[in-house]
């Protein structure tokens, strides 16, 4: 009898914990707004991404493109996103022969979102991340580890930029 009541009690407690969320104004980030206005997902599809120099910039632009253009590239975008990147490497672990055994890769992306109609700056912000990788004796392994670290850093930068854009479009009417 006792085990039979456990699922019912669990559901009741879960309902009691989730019930306050209904009144707090919580809404999905990428959902459409309750007033019938466009949500973040619609606005994100109207952002044109400027070319970003160098290979890492190209990869970051492709990651952003994959996330922004769920319904295809806009023909007349309402917003323009410009991104500038900087990166640096710092040796963390030093071997007895004065070579690095571990390296930290820092990447910073400065991005500006402008309204296309009047060139007004809507967002002017930075995204930054740090990843590390091992410097191995085998050169190919080090190159592979560095490339993997770059990929992780670029993915993190794209996630930060996307989240910031979605929050902006989800909370304001530009």
Enumerate the language-model features and the residues they cover.
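Bacterial N-terminal signal peptides that target proteins for export
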Residues: 1-13
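C-terminal motif of bacterial Sec signal peptides marking the signal peptidase cleavage site
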Residues: 19-23
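Surface-exposed short loop/turn segments
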Residues: 71-126, 131-148
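Post-signal peptide N-terminal segment of mature Sec-exported envelope proteins
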Residues: 33-55
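C-terminal/domain-edge helix-coil "capping" segments
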Residues: 144-174
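Bacterial signal peptide processing site
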Residues: 25-28
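Sec/Tat-exported extracytoplasmic proteins
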Residues: 67-72, 115-117, 160-169
């Amino acid at each position: 009898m006792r085990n039979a009541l456990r699922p019912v009690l669990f559901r009741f407690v879960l309902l009691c914990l989730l019930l306050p969320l209904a009144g707090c104004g919580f809404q999905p980030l990428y959902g459409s707004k309750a007033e019938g206005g466009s949500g973040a997902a619609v606005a994100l599809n109207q952002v044109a991404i400027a070319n970003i120099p160098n290979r890492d910039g190209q990869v970051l632009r492709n990651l952003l493109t994959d996330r922004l253009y769920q319904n295809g590239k806009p023909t007349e975008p309402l917003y323009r996103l410009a991104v500038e990147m900087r990166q640096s490497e710092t040796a963390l672990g030093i071997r007895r022969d004065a070579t690095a055994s571990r390296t930290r890769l820092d990447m910073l992306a400065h991005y500006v979102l402008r309204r296309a109609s009047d060139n007004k700056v809507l967002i002017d912000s930075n995204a930054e991340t740090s990843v590390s990788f091992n410097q191995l004796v085998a050169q190919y392994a080090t190159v592979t580890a560095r490339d993997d670290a770059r990929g992780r850093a670029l993915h993190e930068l794209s996630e930060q930029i996307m989240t910031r854009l979605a929050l902006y479009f989800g909370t304001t009417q530009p």
